[in-house]
Swiss-Prot record:
GO process annotations (BP): photorespiration; reductive pentose-phosphate cycle
HAMAP family according to UniProt: RuBisCO_S_bact (MF_00859)
GO molecular function ontology, one term from the record: ribulose-bisphosphate carboxylase activity
Highest taxon above the source species: Eukaryota
Organism in which the protein naturally occurs: Amaranthus hypochondriacus (Prince-of-Wales feather)
Additional remarks: The basic functional RuBisCO is composed of a large chain homodimer in a 'head-to-tail' conformation. In form I RuBisCO this homodimer is arranged in a barrel-like tetramer with the small subunits forming a tetrameric 'cap' on each end of the 'barrel'.
Gene Ontology CC annotations of this record: chloroplast
Chief place where the protein resides: plastid
Entry protein name: Ribulose bisphosphate carboxylase small subunit, chloroplastic 1
Subunit structure and binding partners: Heterohexadecamer of 8 large and 8 small subunits.
Amino acid sequence: MASSMLSNAAMATTAATAGAQASMVAPFNGLKSFATFPITKKSSNDFSSLPSNGGRVQCMQVWPPVGKKKFETLSYLPPLSDAQLLAQVQYLLNKGWIPCIEFELEHPFVYRENHRSPGYQDGRYWTMWKLPMYGCTDPAQVLNEVEEAKKAYPSAFIRIIGFDNKRQVQCVSFIAYKPAGGL
């Protein structure tokens, strides 16, 4: 008897909630038709609504990819003068980075000779000139080493690297010297 009263009470509660839920949620009638939304079609030759940057598009040029290969940082600038090189080396010394000098005789750009996937011998790693210049505080000392590297290898590309020994990463790299017939 108690079980039948309990089940009747549970059924009544369930029926009451089902009725309340049915009245709260509208039934799904499918997607609305597009007849209520007016669609205006613009003519294909109307350019008045296109975004504009005030005519600067005519001034933009693409960098020519043939005969003007680029290297690393600062490579879109003209070759750096000695004063500009001194300023760049002073910057990396002020940051606490260690200057390193590297050179490359044959392939100054990344290339793939042995495999299609990147590897150790694909032109990313250049030969280091002497040792990293630990404890160097004078940018002129770095440029003297660049001059020595130029005398030893006049046909080599020479770059200066700023190495952070705390994070153990290369932070800056720029070309210090390109040979006369260089790319």
